[in-house]
């Protein structure tokens, strides 16, 4: 009715002014009949849009048209993947790690547009964009590995990111090289090691030292049945390839054993889980004054709930991948940016990224989904603790661990589903201490202990590389 009244009003207005002018300068119409035609067209368009919206609300089916993500590196990687998909790959019984090795260069010296796109307020590379590129290149490598083996139709999904460790985040004065290759393959999953190093004139003469390393896990599934699909086996050749393959095998076995034992799901079934439960109860004892007698509580402590931050967004079609789902790298970037803001607000100074501790992808995100990102400081180490002792040159600097959860909201049925969970570790480079974060419930305390336990295990596994972060380089 609103649309009809608007059009009728325009007809009357034009009729009153017909002696002054035979045209309407705003609409460029010369007769009331043309207005009627425009109105009918407007009604048709409105009805079409309304039908589309209603269909979207009911079904949430994304378009099959593929769009290109605005990030220039990601766009180039997707174009490479599409070109590669049109080529015929010879059948292969197995592949070596070197077959999948892929590199892409950031030519910051010669490309001013690229330099501007990746520059942070501090003059370093924007780590959120780096996360997008890591996921995009890892996807290319995964597609390259499975090509020419087994089923022609399969879908590769990012299952997890184990850890992305940084030595530093460089300024944009020199070119950088992003590289990756498959390092371990199970039955239907593969692990891909990603690295970034600075380009210099002697890169061909010696092995460059990377400033970032991370491991992405991809799983191959049938797009119709969503069941795992067997992929091409990996045969390591060199001693280094064999060592990394063995490490990947150990990590895969540890994850499988943890799932069987129930570690991390709140069920104290083992001796380790019982110790974790005791540790959680101790955290609740520490939090008791804040919960019951806040005026007498430690002023250097704060409840976890008071560190929360949140934002929401609609998943747009411009950030979907080739499987018509929202690009995982984009979700990682949005989660990182919220985590950075939460740490900045908590610590009172510009934090510095130390590592991406863990990312799990529980469910895909569709175009049009309403996303809610929730962040909080899950725990802090005011004096750096045992983990902080491994921070290069700054053994006593406080560390802050941020958890970000991404929920897909469904207002039509008043439901929310957890899609992703992210963990980030930051360091406060000039602070001597920070407030201790304590849980407000036993459930939160258990999650804190689980995260602490995972971090301590990872620190022991990666000792000698993980958490060697040169703060003076920034």
Label every model-predicted segment:
Residues 1-64:
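N-terminal mitochondrial targeting presequence
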Residues 43-85, 168-174, 183-269, 367, ...:
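HotDog/MaoC-like acyl-thioester-processing domains
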Residues 99-111, 305-316:
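Short amphipathic
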Residues 125-151, 327-349:
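Active-site helix/loop of acyl-thioester processing domains in fatty-acid/polyketide metabolism
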Residues 151-177, 202, 348-364, 369, ...:
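A cross-kingdom feature marking solvent-exposed beta-strand/loop segments within repeated
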Residues 259-304:
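Extended repeat-based solenoid scaffolds, especially LRR ectodomains
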């Amino acid at each position: 009715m609103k649309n009809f009244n608007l059009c009728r009003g325009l007809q009357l207005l034009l009729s009153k002014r017909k002696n002054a002018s035979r045209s309407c300068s705003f609409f460029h119409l010369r007769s009331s009949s043309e207005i009627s035609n425009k109105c009918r067209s407007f009604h048709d368009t409105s009805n079409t849009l309304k039908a589309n919206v209603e269909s979207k609300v009911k079904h949430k089916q994304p378009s099959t048209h593929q769009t290109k993500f605005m990030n220039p590196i990601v766009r180039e990687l997707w174009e490479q993947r599409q070109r590669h998909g049109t080529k015929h790959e010879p059948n292969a019984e197995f592949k070596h790690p070197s077959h999948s090795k892929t590199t892409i260069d950031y030519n910051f010296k010669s490309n001013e547009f690229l330099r501007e796109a990746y520059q942070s307020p501090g003059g370093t590379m924007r780590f959120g964009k780096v996360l997008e590129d890591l996921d995009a290149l890892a996807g290319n490598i995964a597609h390259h590995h499975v090509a020419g083996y087994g089923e022609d139709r399969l879908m590769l999904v990012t299952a997890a990111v184990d850890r992305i460790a940084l030595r530093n985040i460089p300024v944009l004065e020199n070119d950088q090289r992003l590289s990756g290759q498959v390092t371990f393959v199970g039955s239907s999953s593969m692990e891909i090691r990603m690295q970034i190093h600075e380009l210099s004139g002697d890169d061909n003469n010696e092995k460059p030292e990377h400033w970032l390393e991370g491991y992405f896990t991809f799983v191959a599934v049938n797009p119709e049945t969503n069941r795992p699909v067997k992929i091409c086996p990996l045969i390591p050749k060199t001693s280094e390839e064999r060592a990394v393959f063995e490490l990947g095998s150990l990590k895969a076995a540890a994850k499988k054993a943890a799932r069987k034992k129930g570690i991390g799901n709140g069920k104290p079934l083992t001796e380790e889980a019982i110790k974790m439960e005791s540790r959680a109860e101790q955290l609740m004892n520490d939090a008791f004054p804040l919960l019951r007698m806040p005026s007498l509580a430690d002023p250097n402590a704060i409840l976890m709930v008071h560190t929360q931050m949140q934002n929401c967004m609609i998943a747009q079609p411009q950030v979907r991948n080739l499987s018509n789902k929202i690009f995982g790298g984009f979700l990682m970037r949005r989660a990182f940016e919220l985590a950075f803001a939460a740490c900045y607000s908590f610590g009172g100074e510009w934090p510095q990224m130390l590592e991406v501790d863990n990312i799990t992808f529980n469910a895909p995100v569709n175009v049009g989904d309403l996303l809610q990102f929730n962040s909080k400081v899950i725990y802090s180490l005011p004096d750096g603790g045992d983990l902080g002792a491994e921070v290069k040159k700054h053994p006593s600097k406080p560390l802050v661990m941020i958890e970000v959860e991404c929920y897909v909201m469904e207002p039509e049925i008043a439901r929310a589903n957890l899609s992703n969970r992210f963990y980030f570790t930051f360091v406060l480079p000039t602070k001597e201490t920070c407030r201790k974060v304590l849980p407000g419930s036993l459930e939160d305390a258990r999650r804190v202990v689980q995260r602490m336990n995972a971090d301590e295990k990872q620190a022991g596994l990666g000792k000698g590389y993980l958490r060697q972060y040169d703060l003076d380089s920034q």
